[in-house]
């Protein structure tokens, strides 16, 4: 019997790139981006399972320069720089391959394709079946009766297999002719020029007639079409060069042999360690790791959950783990499925109808003395409020505790926290209810046990989480900030914000009319009607008809992305109109129509969802609608705020905004004398910075100087690099670097803070805010310069951003208490960035003008005064 020999060759860069863009930007609890590694691991696991290779190698590109650059200097010149979020994941991909005991190889001056081509041909001679995996169709030229090329399509696991027959079926060509096709049509992704004006269809037609580029060029006279003949004659050398560039080498000087690529299985222990470190719980389950642990976990024994038909006070004791169950993300709309309670008397499931109709149950939920332990108290507050019940006595929130301890983790349900702490007593919501459109409510037996297990997990986790919070000096952050804030956010969400639907619709009509105007103007300049939203049609108009210089090409034609158009804005009037057209179109579709979709028809209110346990800095964000994201650079964008109005007659919107809070926090943390002096004396900080950096008197500071100073002031807060500042100011990187150096020379305290924060973070592994919030930054020890630089900037800016976020949260808690204490009707509606938005009766506005700044400015004592600007008006737009 012939021994089975199968070699799998993988284009590592291509699949890593594909995985990165196919998945959302994920990160683990330490803040390390992981989406490319996760996707690559999924591809790898599927590959090993499906292909069962006897031999395997993953090839990588060794660098940016290859022997092909000697032929054509601009080879791959149009490619965008690899995103740093992907670059930082490449070492983990290599580490993963080592754990899987899969050979990897790269060769200076050669591409991964050349390594693959050389090994494929060598393996064919040795009688191997060969499978090549890539996202690059160039490799289809390697397809033979012994080599199949698998090209990824959508996502990361959907592949198309190219055999010689499939190549013929798809292109009408042989695999050997793929390089001829590239020679004629070029390849924008690799910046291979080809012959201008020759696309895929023309190239295929010519090759069917002439077989190869060389034979075609020998027989140009036989080509039909005068223009095509002229192009082929003019670009003859370019066609031959393009074919050469597209040709994969099959005799590269590699130092590995096929026989040395034997695959004998992976190192289970190492793979599990990597998956755990990166937070790949789903992949751990696929390895069987969790199930193995679960079998040893005695707590998985059946629990006795009693279904309650009549709520009595003897089961409602304090403290109790309490579950308010819904499925789906939008808890403002999802119905409650039921409740569960676990305490010293037992485990209970209470069907929704029985619970909400029970006065005993309602009294217990609304009794502040009856302590409840929950998961996501804000969600529970909102869900119960829609039933006319106020949740009180929520003493412990598993979600918030876990978030404070592990801010980089994403906790979707109780099971995800339980797993992190080695508890296997509850299944994930997804495994019980299903996902997406397949989500469904199970039988009452299944539901009652699932809810009972959830409550049991909450009860079991509490002690562990409290202990860890105490050890981290974070119990006060949890008890005094995040827990009370959750209840306030819940009230804000359920109160909602009134939307003037008629005004919003009028805005939509106005924007529609403006869009029409721009469309007509663009068509007039172009000299013909065309679909402005079609990149292909727009590209033809801009680059062929008008003749603008081509900045970048895509596989389907010319790139007309925003960054490309901005580079061309000064070249022709039409470009500015197109940019305006797109901005107006986005305002209309994303914001006007988007807001109308989420506005409740009965109350004309939107009920956003604040994400309290999401960001690593502690900042709040919001969803459905994302109120943080309403554009304010364009006047049309700012005007959208006109649609947010008071919910009652003779009321106004009142907005209060921290002035330069992050710079004030920086002054406090860094103890920089210059910054402290400026803020203490209420100086214009940007003018002061310009004076110090440019060494000029106050009256000599120009608007350009102040603008540069402002950019560097805020840039420092966000850990800006010389590159980032150069982009913001439109200056060279060298000039930006010199500006930053002069800034740090003038602000020695800031310089010392930046250096000290990085050193401290390297020693501890994390940075902290003024209220002891932590952010873990393991990338500080990375050997990769880009990863390490990003981590250092994170170490510098997180204490500033995080402390500012904590201050505004504290202000919200203090304000809620003051409104209640003074028995005011005013309501806190929104928190957006550094701004608090209220609605209040007109007669209370004068009170708020004194009360709100006083409370906000004293939320936390700093070495410099906090300053609050405020205004009121009939809409959010007018409160400026």
UniProtKB/Swiss-Prot annotation:
Gene3D superfamilies: 3.30.70.370, 5' to 3' exonuclease, C-terminal subdomain (1.10.150.20), 5'-nuclease (3.40.50.1010), Ribonuclease H-like superfamily/Ribonuclease H (3.30.420.10), Taq DNA Polymerase, Chain T, domain 4 (1.20.1060.10)
Example of a GO MF term: DNA binding
Root EC class: transferase
SMART domains with a match to the protein in the record: 35EXOc, 53EXOc, HhH2, POLAc
EC number: 2.7.7.7
Record-annotated 3'-5' exonuclease domain positions: 302-470
Pfam families: 5_3_exonuc, 5_3_exonuc_N, DNA_pol_A, DNA_polI_exo1
Signal peptide: none
Domain 5'-3' exonuclease: 174-268
Keyword field: DNA damage, DNA repair, DNA replication, DNA-binding, DNA-directed DNA polymerase, Exonuclease, Hydrolase, Nuclease, Nucleotidyltransferase, Transferase
GO biological process, one term: DNA-templated DNA replication
Record field: catalytic activity: DNA(n) + a 2'-deoxyribonucleoside 5'-triphosphate = DNA(n+1) + diphosphate
Record's subunit section: Single-chain monomer with multiple functions.
Chain's role: In addition to polymerase activity, this DNA polymerase exhibits 3'-5' and 5'-3' exonuclease activity.
Annotated family: Belongs to the DNA polymerase type-A family.
Xref: NCBIfam families: pola, PRK05755.1
Protein name: DNA polymerase I
Species of the source: Bacillus subtilis (strain 168)
Gene this chain is encoded by: polA
């Amino acid at each position: 019997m012939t021994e089975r020999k199968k070699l799998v060759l993988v284009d590592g860069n291509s699949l890593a790139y594909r995985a990165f863009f196919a998945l959302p930007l994920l990160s683990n609890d330490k803040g390390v981006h992981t989406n490319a590694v996760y996707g690559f691991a999924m591809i790898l696991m599927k590959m090993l399972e499906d292909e069962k290779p006897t031999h395997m190698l993953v090839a990588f590109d060794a660098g940016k320069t290859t022997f092909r650059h000697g032929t054509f200097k601009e080879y791959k010149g149009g490619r965008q720089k690899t995103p740093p979020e992907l670059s930082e994941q490449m070492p983990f991909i290599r580490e993963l391959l080592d754990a899987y005991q899969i050979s990897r190889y790269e060769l200076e001056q050669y591409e991964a394709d050349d390594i693959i081509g050389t090994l494929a041909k060598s393996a064919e001679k040795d009688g191997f079946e060969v499978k090549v995996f890539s996202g690059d169709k160039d490799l289809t030229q390697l397809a033979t009766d012994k080599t199949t090329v698998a090209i990824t399509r959508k996502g990361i696991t959907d592949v198309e297999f190219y055999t010689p027959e499939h190549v013929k079926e798809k292109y009408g060509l042989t695999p050997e002719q793929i390089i001829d096709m590239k020679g004629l049509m070029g390849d924008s992704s690799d910046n291979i020029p080809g012959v201008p004006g020759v696309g895929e269809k023309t190239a295929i037609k010519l090759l069917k007639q002439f077989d190869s580029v060389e034979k075609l060029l020998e027989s140009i006279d036989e080509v039909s079409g005068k223009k095509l003949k002229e192009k082929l004659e003019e670009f003859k050398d370019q066609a031959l060069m393009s074919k050469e560039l597209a040709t994969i080498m099959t005799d590269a000087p590699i130092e590995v042999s096929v026989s040395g690529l034997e695959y004998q299985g992976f190192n289970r222990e190492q793979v599990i360690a990597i998956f755990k470190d990166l937070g790949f719980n789903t992949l751990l389950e696929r390895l069987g790791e969790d199930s193995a642990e679960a079998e040893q976990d005695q707590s998985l024994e059946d629990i006795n959950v009693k279904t309650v038909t009549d709520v009595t006070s003897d089961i409602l004791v304090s403290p109790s783990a309490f579950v308010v169950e819904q499925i789906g993300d939008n808890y403002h709309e999802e119905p409650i499925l039921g409740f569960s309670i676990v305490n010293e008397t037992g485990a209970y499931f209470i069907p929704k109808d029985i619970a909400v109709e029970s006065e005993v149950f309602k009294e217990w939920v609304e009794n502040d003395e009856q302590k409840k332990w929950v998961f996501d108290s804000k969600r529970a507050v909102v869900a119960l409020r829609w039933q006319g019940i106020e949740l009180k006595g929520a003493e412990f929130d598993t979600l918030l505790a876990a978030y404070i301890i592990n801010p980089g983790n994403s906790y979707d349900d109780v099971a995800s926290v339980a797993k992190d702490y080695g508890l296997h007593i509850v299944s994930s919501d997804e495994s019980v209810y299903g996902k997406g459109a397949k989500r469904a409510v199970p039988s009452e037996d299944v539901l009652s046990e699932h809810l009972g297990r959830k409550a049991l997990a909450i009860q079991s986790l509490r002690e562990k989480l409290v202990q860890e919070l105490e050890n981290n000096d974070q119990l006060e952050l949890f008890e005094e900030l995040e827990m009370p804030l959750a209840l306030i956010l819940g009230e804000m969400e359920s109160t909602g914000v009134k939307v003037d639907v008629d005004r919003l619709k009028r805005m939509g009509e106005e924007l529609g009319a403006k869009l029409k105007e721009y469309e007509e103007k663009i068509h007039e300049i172009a000299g013909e009607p065309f679909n402005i939203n079609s990149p292909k049609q727009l590209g033809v108009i801009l680059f062929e008809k008008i003749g603008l210089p081509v900045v970048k090409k895509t596989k389907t034609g010319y790139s007309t992305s925003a960054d490309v158009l901005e580079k061309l804005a000064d070249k022709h009037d039409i470009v500015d109109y197109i940019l305006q057209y797109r901005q107006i179109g986005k305002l209309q579709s994303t914001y006007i129509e988007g807001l109308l979709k989420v506005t409740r028809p009965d109350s004309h209110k939107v009920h956003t969802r604040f994400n309290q346990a999401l960001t690593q800095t502690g900042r709040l964000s919001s969803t459905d609608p994302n109120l943080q994201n309403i554009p304010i650079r364009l006047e049309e964008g700012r005007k959208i705020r006109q649609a947010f109005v008071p919910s009652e007659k003779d009321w106004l919107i009142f907005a209060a905004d921290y002035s330069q809070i992050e710079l004030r926090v920086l002054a406090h943390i860094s103890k920089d004398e210059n910054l402290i002096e400026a803020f203490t004396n209420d100086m214009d900080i940007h003018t002061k910075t310009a004076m110090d950096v440019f060494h000029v008197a106050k009256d000599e500071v120009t608007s350009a100087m102040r603008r540069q100073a402002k950019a560097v002031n805020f840039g420092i807060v966000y850990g800006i690099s010389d590159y980032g500042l150069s982009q913001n100011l439109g200056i060279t990187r060298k000039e930006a670097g010199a500006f930053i150096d002069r800034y740090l020379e003038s602000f020695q305290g800031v310089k010392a803070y930046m250096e000290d924060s990085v050193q401290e973070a390297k020693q501890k592994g994390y940075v902290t805010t003024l209220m002891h919030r932590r952010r873990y930054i393991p990338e500080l020890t990375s050997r990769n310069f880009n990863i390490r630089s990003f981590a250092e900037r994170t170490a510098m800016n997180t204490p500033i951003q995080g402390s500012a976020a904590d201050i505004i949260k504290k202000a919200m808690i203090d304000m809620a208490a003051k409104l209640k204490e003074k028995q005011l009707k005013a309501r806190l509606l929104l928190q957006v960035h550094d701004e608090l938005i209220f609605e209040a009766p007109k007669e209370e506005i004068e009170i708020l003008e004194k009360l709100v700044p006083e409370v906000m400015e004293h939320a936390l004592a700093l070495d410099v005064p906090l300053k609050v600007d405020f205004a009121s008006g009939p809409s959010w737009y007018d409160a400026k």
